[in-house]
């Protein structure tokens, strides 16, 4: 099963009609796809990955295996409700939280190939990709080009940085349990050698194979499915734990602002409307549950 590849440059070229059709098909039938010719500087992508890897090795690797999580893989333990990951979350917009991680700020300044400005440039370029995709999705739904962008405004942009260390017993725990993402458009810079990410399609788990060609992996979150009234899909995905290697994941979220009111356009129909922060509050307790049941509950809560 071959994951779709969207040529972002073609959305503005002579093959725009074909590229837009491919984007629509990927969103409607897959909910995830690769993006090539995205315009992000490849050396910048490598610098960001190098920085994250160096920071993990220096500040997080040793402490991870001292956590209760690692100890829970003992013979009598039941680790079914934990995730084998070492992670933190950086906020970029509307407010930056880098000061909450003093060691990261220090590393930015010391690391001779990457600094805070480098990361800011990467996020700026990545946001442009997200906005371009949002325009394509909006147009394909028959809406104004800036519909998703306006609905999200001001958007919340943040990055989940995760490392999935080698696991002594990968049959008993997942790197990250199966779930859909709460937000909008998720753009992933992932490991180029260590596998693990899988998406659920047509009754089977589809592996997202590591690649070295600097494509960005994209998946849609719950808000896009809801705004499209189910035309586009947020898809169940998970990360397998691996016995060998330490997988890198840098996932940037282009989400609605907390007070953004989410509902389909009148053309697409959907009962009620709600603030994204209200959805997040409900999502926290149901993240690893059934998405259809969650959507039905949301409909009932906000259509009264």
Ranges and model annotations:
Residues 1-304:
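Peripheral, non-catalytic segments flanking oxidoreductase cores
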């Amino acid at each position: 099963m071959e994951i779709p590849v969207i040529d972002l440059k073609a959305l503005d070229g002579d093959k725009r009609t074909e590229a837009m059709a491919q984007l629509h098909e990927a969103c409607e039938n897959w909910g995830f796809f690769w993006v090539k010719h995205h315009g992000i500087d490849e050396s910048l992508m490598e610098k960001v990955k190098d920085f994250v890897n160096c920071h993990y090795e220096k500040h997080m690797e040793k402490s991870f295996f001292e956590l209760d999580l690692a100890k829970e893989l003992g013979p009598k333990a039941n680790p079914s409700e934990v995730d084998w990951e070492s992670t933190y979350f950086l906020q970029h917009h509307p407010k930056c939280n880098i000061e909450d991680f003093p060691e990261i700020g220090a590393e930015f300044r010391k690391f001779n190939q990457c600094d805070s400005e480098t990361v800011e440039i990467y996020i700026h370029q990545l946001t442009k990709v997200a906005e371009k995709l949002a325009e394509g999705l909006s147009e394909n739904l028959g809406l104004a080009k800036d519909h998703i962008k306006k609905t999200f405004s001001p958007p919340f942009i943040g990055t989940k940085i995760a490392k999935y260390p080698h696991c002594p017993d990968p049959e008993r725990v997942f790197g990250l349990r199966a779930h859909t993402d709460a937000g909008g458009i998720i753009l992933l810079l992932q490991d180029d050698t260590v596998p693990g990410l899988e998406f659920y399609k047509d009754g089977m788990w589809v592996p997202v194979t590591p690649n070295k060609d600097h494509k960005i992996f994209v998946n849609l979150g719950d808000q896009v499915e809801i705004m499209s009234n189910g035309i586009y899909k947020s898809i169940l995905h998970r990360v397998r734990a691996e016995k060998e290697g330490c997988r890198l994941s840098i996932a940037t979220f282009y989400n609605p602002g907390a007070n953004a009111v989410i509902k389909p356009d009148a053309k697409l129909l959907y009962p009620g409307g709600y603030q994204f922060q209200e959805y997040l509050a409900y999502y926290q307790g149901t993240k690893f549950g059934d998405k259809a049941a969650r959507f039905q509950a949301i409909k009932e809560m906000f259509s009264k």
